[in-house]
Amino acid sequence: MSGGVSAASKNAVGLDDPEELLQRADAVIAAARPGEQVEVSLGESIDTEIRAYGGAVESLSSARSVGALVRVIVGGRSGVATTTLTDPETLACLLVEARTNAADAGVDPVAAVARPDGVAQPDLELYDPRFELLSVDDKVDLALALEAAVMSGDPRMSGVEGADYGDSVVVSAVANTAGIRAAQRESGAGL
C-alpha cells in the first residue's frame, strides 16, 4: 500500500485505524516550529445510501471520503491547508502549505488553537462493528423489507415514495500543539 500504511491498520471496510490517524497527526505536530500553534484534523468515512421503490432498488450509492486539514497560527496570522489524502508525506507538505498561507494572512490577535479544558471526555461507545459485516446485498434486503413492511401494514396503503436505508462508518483524529489529542471511530444507520 502507498503512503506507508499497512493492510493491518485498515478495518473491514478499508478505513484506517483512528489511532493510526492520531499518530500521523502527532507527527505533524512534532514538526511545529517555535512560536507556531498547529492543529491537525484527519478523517475518513464510508457512507451507503439505498432507496427501494416498487419492490426494487431505485438508487444505491456508496462513497468513501478522506480529508485532512492543517492549521498554523504564527504571530496572529492563521493559515489553513486541506487535502483528500492522509499519508505522512502529504501531511508534511500540507504543513508547509499552511505555513505559507499563514504568512500571507492578516493578523488576528485572538487567533488560537483550542486548549484542553480539563473536562474528561465521556466514555461513549459510538461504534458498532456489525455495520462493517453487512454486505451491500444485506443492506438492499433491509431497504426492500422496510418497503414491504410499510405496504403490508395497512390495506389502505397504495404506495410509498420510497424506503431508504443509510449507514456510515467514520474514523477521525485531531491533535494540536496545545495538548488536544483525540481519536475515535463511530457508526450509524437509519431506515
Predicted regions and their residues:
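Active-site bordering "gate/hinge" segments
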Residues: M1-L191
